Amino acid sequence: GKYSGKKNSSETYLKINIEAAKEACAQIRLRNISGIIIIDFIDMESESDRHKLMDELKLLAGKDPVKTTVVDMTSLNLVEMTRKKVRKPLYEQISLPKSDN
């Protein structure tokens, strides 16, 4: 990946998780995913790093025109988010109707 062992591992994990958060939020918007969303991040032991990641996620979610709420992070580094459904997700919009045959 982009980050290697030149820095300490906790700093590397934080950077990777922040990049993952950016991409996850972009994909959620692109695919118009709604409902309860769980994101599994690399384990971080530092409470400070967890807060930095949550702050970044809340900032990213705030940029979404659809109401998106970052709920919490569990001890397993799973982040729960909710996103309001305003229209069908992308996969439903482009799916062909099933035939009756």
What does each model-identified segment do?
Residues 2-101:
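Conserved glycine-centered short motifs in functionally critical loops
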